[in-house]
Curated annotation (Swiss-Prot):
One Gene Ontology term of the molecular function aspect: transmembrane signaling receptor activity
Summary of subunit composition and partner proteins: Homodimer. Interacts with CLEC2B.
Record's protein name: Killer cell lectin-like receptor subfamily F member 1
Function: Functions as an activating receptor involved in immunosurveillance upon binding to various ligands displayed at the surface of myeloid cells. Upon interaction with CLEC2B ligand, stimulates NK-cell cytotoxicity and cytokine production leading to the cytolysis of malignant CLEC2B-expressing myeloid cells. Actviation of the common cytotoxicity pathway involves SRC and SYK kinases.
């Protein structure tokens, strides 16, 4: 009986000792795992930081390359536009086109999509008619095609239009004399900047602007000419 009690006591003590050792091993293993987890987490953070820096550097290099490419092409493009010739403008209004303007226009050219038979230039689309209509009918025609009559903003655009006219006839543009404002006004509501070009002819009610060769003329709006749509 005593031997049996001694055996049971030893057995219980052995189980307690084994349980304690197992618990200690579990805590020890957890500490090791936690230690390596922290190390791996640190390595992962470092790698992510390196990748982020590499990506930023790559973006900067690409941006500098695009800018440099635009700058290199600026001189040749300016010469090309000068060779085209331009419409008659006020004295002293010619200005140099900056590299930034050229780069922006190239970027716009890459994103804009023009319909068939439309010409693309500096982020805009142009359509040159073969028919002849009055100024108001030309205006409506462009609106129906989700566009508007030609609005010229600078000498480069004027040179582009002149290059593509290829005719000596009058062509309507989106400019008319409004009696309400008593000034030449574009179809978008903005007034004509007199520094851009001269308008040859009277500035009076029922007068609309038309391009012919290298000049802008004031003509009666009911006259029938070809026209240019733009969007």
């Amino acid at each position: 009986m005593q031997d049996e009690e001694r055996y049971m006591t030893l057995n219980v003590q052995s189980k307690k000792r084994t349980s304690t050792q197992t618990t200690q091993l579990t805590f020890k293993d957890y500490s090791v795992v936690l230690h390596w987890y922290k190390i791996l987490l640190g390595i992962s953070g470092t790698l992510n930081g390196i990748l982020a820096l590499a990506l930023i550097s790559l973006i900067l290099l690409v941006s500098q390359g695009v800018l440099l490419k635009c700058q290199k092409g600026s001189h040749s493009n300016t010469t090309e536009h000068e060779d085209i010739g331009d419409l008659k403008m006020n004295n002293g209004t010619r200005r140099n086109t900056s590299n930034k303007d050229l780069c922006v226009s190239r970027s716009a050219d890459q994103t804009v999509l023009c319909q068939s038979e439309w010409l693309k230039y500096r982020g805009k689309c142009y359509w040159f008619s073969n028919e002849m209509k009055s100024w108001s009918d030309s205006y409506v025609y462009c609106l129906e095609r989700k566009s508007h009559l030609l609005i010229i903003q600078d000498e480069l655009e004027m040179a582009f239009i002149q290059k593509n006219l290829r005719q000596s006839n009058y062509v309507w543009m989106g400019l008319n004399f409004t009696s309400l404002k008593m000034t030449w006004t574009w179809v978008d509501g903005s007034p004509l900047d007199p520094k851009i070009f001269f308008i040859k002819g009277p500035a009076k009610e029922n007068s609309c602007a038309a391009i012919k060769e290298s000049k802008i003329y004031s003509e009666t709006c009911s006259s029938v000419f070809k026209w240019i749509c733009q969007y």
